[in-house]
Amino acid sequence: MARIAGINIPDHKHAVIALTAIYGIGRTRAKAICAATAIAEDAKIKELSEAQIDTLREEVAKYTVEGDLRREVSMNIKRLMDLGCYRGLRHRRSLPLRGQRTKTNARTRKGPRKPIKK
């Protein structure tokens, strides 16, 4: 198994699909990385040479991925909450942010129903 950005990449999958195992890399970015490194998208990871894997590592290192990206997202949410803006308040109350109705739906965001105590 190749290790890129601290993640074990599945070596039995095609390069584009295998790169999506890294948080922050989707199909589009994986295709761009393969194009930049001149690696065929349908080449399996186990068929790649060590030099090709090193070029993949260097190309992935140009992007914000994994822990850094998770930290950046959580800091953005924390910043919204500290500002006290509408989106920050919705985050703080665990409610939907983007105008969805909450009278009947939003169970995923709100969590399980809380019974009414008598």
Curated annotation (Swiss-Prot):
Domain of life: Bacteria
Gene that produces this protein: rpsM
InterPro entries referenced in this protein's UniProt entry, alphabetically: Rbsml_uS13_C, Ribosomal_uS13, Ribosomal_uS13-like_H2TH, Ribosomal_uS13_bac-type, Ribosomal_uS13_CS
Annotated Gene Ontology cellular component terms: cytosol; small ribosomal subunit
Similarity section: Belongs to the universal ribosomal protein uS13 family.
One BP term from GO: translation
GO MF entry, a single one: rRNA binding
Protein name, entry field: Small ribosomal subunit protein uS13
Subunit structure: Part of the 30S ribosomal subunit. Forms a loose heterodimer with protein S19. Forms two bridges to the 50S subunit in the 70S ribosome.
PANTHER family from the UniProt entry: 30S RIBOSOMAL PROTEIN S13/40S RIBOSOMAL PROTEIN S18, SMALL RIBOSOMAL SUBUNIT PROTEIN US13M
Keywords per UniProt: Ribonucleoprotein, Ribosomal protein, RNA-binding, rRNA-binding, tRNA-binding
Annotated spans, Disordered: 94-118
Biological role: Located at the top of the head of the 30S subunit, it contacts several helices of the 16S rRNA. In the 70S ribosome it contacts the 23S rRNA (bridge B1a) and protein L5 of the 50S subunit (bridge B1b), connecting the 2 subunits; these bridges are implicated in subunit movement. Contacts the tRNAs in the A and P-sites.
